[in-house]
From Swiss-Prot:
EC number(s) stated in the UniProt entry for this protein: 2.7.11.1
Protein name: Serine/threonine-protein kinase KIPK1
Active site: D663 (proton acceptor)
Residue span of region Disordered: 20-40, 70-113, 189-227, 305-343, 395-438, 466-493, 738-773
Keywords annotated in UniProt: ATP-binding, Cytoplasm, Kinase, Nucleotide-binding, Nucleus, Serine/threonine-protein kinase, Transferase
Pfam families: Pkinase (PF00069)
CDD domains the UniProt entry points to: STKc_phototropin_like
UniProt similarity note: Belongs to the protein kinase superfamily. Ser/Thr protein kinase family.
Length: 934
């Protein structure tokens, strides 16, 4: 039967049986007829029911809409009710005959069937001839505008689907009515033929039109050939099993149901009108040849990425019969030719994009589904999802084997295979269309993946990771990525640090806040060059100080200008005095530290029974020496606040790690070259457990703790509301505005906050990481800085650091410690018994005195910071206006003087005695460098 308006009939014939006589038609078409009247009558009796059923299905599934020229009728009558009625004509006989006389007009093949159905087939043939004549005339009229762009493919596909009208179907045929918005179902019946000879056969016709050359019939088992596919978008469509009734495609012993969506029309769906033939490429799904199951083709994604198509790369359509063998029977398949009305020509604006979409669909449950076996690799036939026509497999195995499965597609028991042709590069052969990818998904999900490649080389593809389907039962992920060398700058969703970079980062103990320090590279270079680092790689320039367990030297790394502070400890001396545990504790603590106000341990090694710790060098000396240089031997209050604020952050970090410092004094606070401080000496520190918690502020509502303290407050003002964070937060150490300045300035948006909002901002949760449960009975520290609980021997915890913090602030402001006596015994007695007193000079603000009073409370449980640690202290009015997050951006009160050894070997060579005197002897260079330990 000839094809018309969106359908084709596929019938079977038995080879080597009855050979029907053939004769040529008017236009060179082969027409087959019955050999005798007896044969026709016998075939009528044997196949009367089957033929009527197929014709009934054909006329019910296909209804051609009337065209703009009213050349086609709107419907057909049922065969059972009006089998002998003549076909309805929409054109007069004269017009129809005139159209048939036009040169080059193709006509449908004549076929001789049963006597009862001659009138219906004749009507079908006449309609095909009329339609073909109309399209040929329109084709000649459109040649004048050949220079204009082609009609948009979206409009062509849409017009193709619009030709199928809405018509109710009977339950016997199982056809689904057409819905323009949701898709249409097109049925292609395949008639199985038994061993008896067949009298109803259809032969494809050949149109000899020079403008549309048709290739010779293929013997490879397919009827459509696609050529010249390049720079086009491919899709992955996953098919799902279903047993729901619908339009089915009979294939041997099984039915396959394919649902089409008319919204699929897009520039990526290539269909070309050339001499009444529609060329359709790419969107193909492998069709099993030996299967008795049903398959649903899910609706395609509406937003399909488009790609450019060059005119010289357009493929030609083969209109050749396809002979295949199914279940021991020979099947002859006839391809259809769809005439198309003239469409207005438009420009096609194409964009290349990469899109991954995951959509879900509702399908029958597992109880209703049937398992589809694997496909036979020998029968690899492709079926177009839009026109239901067999296509030639154009996949070329020119890709790596790991991504190629074009010739052996397989279907697992829990999912169906989907065929995807990868994009060909611009510079590759136009006949190469990539390889086929087979992916899997769960039964209730559909994954549509579109990929477009516009790069001319293999390194421009990039990494692509497919989203995991939302079905909880699915545990498979599809991930496509390239090497990091091919996709520099691309980050996948499962990014991880490489082992090489990870080892290079932590092999030398690199710290984030010191990651840009050139001293790391210098140390690493020596380790790589010599295999290990030792004392022989350093030149000792100067003795910086002596402590209880070791001596600190200024050293220079040989071959560089990098200066380090090396703490050298004699292992035999430590073992003899039972101080090895203290040295070991300091090494472990230094390894843990990573803070801008704490030392950085660059390396540690043992050389000649000497344990060495290589740390950063602070050329500014310590706060004790720096205080001696100040006028009145005390710091101004702003400078003191700068230093104690950074010390407070260092103590907060230590307490968060479960480290109680216990030896806070000006001698252990060094000044870096940038003016900021560094806390050092951890041999007396105590390690304990800590449990960080979040707490809320308990300040009374409606009160501003920043304004509570003043000249009229008494000394007994250490209340919870005094330690609340101030409402206004400005930059580090910015000058306060007087009342006159505040009255003269313009109000800002933040000034209009309600009291409730201000209270909520002050009552935000605070992190408390104070080791409140830590207890120790050791008598450690310096006499003047010892806490009362240490002297009494009652056991102590983290509160001893806040006592020493108060003593340090007192000394920085007044130039002396608050409880110093004539000797150590009197000093200890004053710490326990004497009340805190403030000298009359220098003048110190009330906020500073109030903070000192809160810190120097003799009962540790009532001491400021004993409950919540640094959170309580940071909220004190003494630190009002301090931005703790940007404290490193604040300008230091004083920068250290230029150090003569900072110039490296050149500066040392200019020193008296030349380079031979660079190495100094270990002798005391001042009392202020000695570590006074109890």
């Amino acid at each position: 039967m000839g094809s018309f308006a969106g359908a084709c009939e596929i019938v079977e014939e038995k080879d080597d049986e009855v050979r029907l006589p053939k004769h040529s038609g008017r236009y060179g078409k082969s027409v087959m007829g019955s050999s005798s009247k007896d044969l026709v009558e016998r075939k009528q009796r044997e196949y009367h029911g089957s033929l009527e059923y197929d014709i009934d299905m054909l006329f019910q599934s296909i209804s051609v809409k009337p065209s703009t020229t009213r050349l086609m009728s709107s419907s057909f009558h049922h065969h059972e009710t009006s089998a002998s009625a003549g076909p309805s004509r929409t054109t007069s006989p004269s017009k129809r005959i005139a159209s048939m006389k036009k040169p080059g007009t193709p006509q449908s093949p004549r076929f001789v069937g049963l006597s009862d159905s001659v009138s219906l087939k004749q009507a079908l043939r006449d309609r095909c001839i009329s339609k073909a004549s109309e399209m040929a005339a329109q084709k000649r009229l459109s040649k004048s505008a050949a220079a204009s762009p082609r009609v948009s493919e979206a409009d062509r596909i849409k017009s193709l689907y619009n030709q199928v009208s809405n018509e109710s179907t009977s339950s016997r045929s199982g056809l689904v009515p057409v819905d323009k918005g949701k898709g249409s179902l097109v049925e292609i019946p395949l008639m199985p033929v038994n061993d008896k000879p067949s009298s109803s056969k259809s032969v494809p016709q050949r149109f000899e039109d020079p403008s549309n050359p048709i290739s010779e019939p293929s013997q490879a088992g397919t009827s459509f050939g696609l050529q010249g596919v390049g720079n086009q978008t491919r899709e992955i469509k996953l098919l799902h099993r279903s047993n729901k009734p619908g339009s089915c495609l009979s294939s041997g012993s099984g039915d396959y149901e394919i649902e089409l969506d008319e919204n699929v029309a897009s520039p990526s769906t290539h269909a070309f009108v050339e001499d009444d033939v529609i060329e359709i490429d790419k969107h193909v799904t492998s069709l099993p040849s030996h299967s008795s199951k049903k398959v649903n083709a899910t609706e395609l994604d509406k937003n399909i990425s488009s790609s450019a198509v060059d005119s010289e790369q357009k493929g030609k359509l083969d209109d050749a019969p396809n002979s295949g063998t199914e279940n021991g029977k020979t099947v002859r398949k006839v391809t259809r030719m769809i005439p198309r009305p003239k469409q207005p020509k438009k420009k096609i604006l194409l964009k290349k994009k990469l899109k991954i979409g995951v959509v879900s669909a509702t399908y029958p449950t597992k109880d209703d589904e049937e398992i589809v076996p694997s496909l036979d690799s020998s029968a690899n036939q492709l079926l177009c999802q839009r026109c239901h026509c067999s296509l030639k497999s154009t996949s070329i195995d020119d890709n790596p084997p790991s991504y190629t499965s074009s010739h052996n597609p397989k279907i697992c028991t829990d999912s169906l295979s989907s065929v995807s042709n990868k994009e060909a590069h611009q510079g590759s052969d136009e006949n190469s269309s990539g390889s086929c990818n087979v992916s899997q998904s769960s039964e209730a999900d559909i994954v549509i993946m579109k990929q477009d490649v516009s790069s001319s080389n293999n390194s421009g593809i990039g990494a692509m990771v497919e989203k995991e389907t939302e079905n909880p039962t699915s545990s498979e992920k599809f991930e496509f990525s390239l090497s990091s060398k091919d996709s520099l700058g691309d980050y996948s969703r499962s990014t991880s640090i490489s082992e090489e970079s990870n080892l290079s980062r932590f092999s030398c103990g690199n710290k984030p806040h010191m990651s840009m320090d050139v001293r790391w590279e210098a140390i690493k270079h020596i380790k790589v060059q010599y295999g290990s680092l030792g004392l022989r790689h350093f030149n000792l320039l100067k003795k910086l100080g002596c402590g209880d367990i070791g001596t600190v030297y200024l050293a220079e790394l040989i071959g560089t200008n990098c200066l380090f502070a090396i703490k050298v400890m004699d292992n035999e001396f430590l073992a003899r005095r039972k101080k090895s545990p203290r040295a070991q504790a300091e090494r472990e603590i230094l390894k843990m530290l990573d803070h801008p106000f704490l030392p950085t341990l660059y390396a540690q090694f043992t050389s000649d029974n000497l344990s060495c710790l290589v740390m950063e060098y602070c050329p500014g000396g310590d706060l004790h020496v720096l205080r001696q240089k100040q006028l009145g031997r005390c710091f101004p209050e702003p400078a003191a606040r700068f230093y104690v604020a950074e010390i407070l952050l260092a103590l907060e970090y230590l307490h968060m790690l479960g480290i109680i410092y216990r030896d806070l004094k000006p001698e252990n606070i060094l000044v870096r070259e940038d003016g900021h401080i560094m806390l050092t000496d951890f041999d007396l520190s105590l390690r304990c457990a800590v449990n960080p918690t979040l707490v809320r502020s308990n300040s009374p509502p409606g009160k501003d703790p920043a304004r509570i303290s003043g000249p009229y407050n008494t000394s007994n003002c250490i209340q919870p509301f005094c330690i609340t964070e101030p409402s206004c937060q400005v930059s580090c150490f910015s000058p306060r505005l007087s009342s006159n300045q505040q009255q003269g300035r313009k109000p800002k948006r933040g000034d209009h906050l309600s009291k409730t909002q201000q209270h909520l901002s002050r009552s935000l949760p605070q992190l408390v990481a104070e080791p409140t449960e830590a207890r120790s009975n050791s008598f450690v520290g310096t006499h003047e800085y010892l806490a009362p609980e240490i002297i009494k021997g009652e056991g102590h915890g983290a509160a001893v650091d806040w006592w020493t913090f108060g003593v340090l602030l007192y000394e920085l402001l007044y130039g002396k410690t608050p409880f110093k006596g004539y000797n150590n015994d009197e000093t200890l007695a004053n710490v326990v018994l004497q009340n805190l007193k403030f000298p009359d000079s220098p003048l110190v603000s009330f906020q500073a005195k109030d903070l000192i009073r809160g810190l120097l409370v003799k009962e540790p449980e009532n001491r400021l910071g004993s409950e919540k640690g640094s959170v309580e202290i940071k909220r004190h009015p003494f630190f009002e206006g301090l931005n703790w997050a940007l404290i490193r951006c604040a300008i230091p009160p004083e920068l250290p003087d230029f150090y003569e050894y900072g110039g490296g070997p050149e500066a040392a060579a200019d020193s008296p005695g030349g380079s031979n005197n660079r190495y100094l002897e270990c002798k005391a260079i001042g009392d202020h460098l000695e570590f006074e330990l109890f």
